[in-house]
Amino acid sequence: MTKSDLIERLTSKHFQLSVKEVEDSVKETLTLMANSLAQGERIEVRGFGSFSLHYRAPRVGRNPKTGDRVELDGKYVPHFKPGKALRERVNAANA
């Protein structure tokens, strides 16, 4: 599902809202979530899951074209951990 698909589905379920209102709401929600993560905050949506940052330590990598060693800096990466209800729902649907 893409962001456009999400907006389309929400608009069809909530016909009293315009496409523009739904689009603005989805964009604002994603912006708020991204800003929270950028500030190091953890986001928890009960029954769905949580978003947090995981630290990746500095390491030595290789340039795929030349094979040369490349020093890679440490960095934070977004991480999603599904909640129990989401895991159970996904497993039930794929059983």
From Swiss-Prot:
GO terms for cellular component: chromosome; cytosol. GO terms for molecular function: DNA binding; structural constituent of chromatin. Disulfide bonds: none annotated. Keywords: DNA recombination, DNA-binding, Transcription, Transcription regulation, Translation regulation. InterPro entries: Hist_DNA-bd (IPR000119), Histone-like_DNA-bd_CS (IPR020816), IHF-like_DNA-bd_dom_sf (IPR010992), IHF_beta (IPR005685). It comes from the Bacteria. One of its GO terms (biological process) is regulation of DNA-templated transcription. This protein is one of the two subunits of integration host factor, a specific DNA-binding protein that functions in genetic recombination as well as in transcriptional and translational control. Heterodimer of an alpha and a beta chain. PANTHER family: DNA-BINDING PROTEIN HU, INTEGRATION HOST FACTOR SUBUNIT BETA. Belongs to the bacterial histone-like protein family. This is Integration host factor subunit beta. The lineage of its organism: Bacteria, Pseudomonadati, Pseudomonadota, Gammaproteobacteria, Alteromonadales. The gene is ihfB.
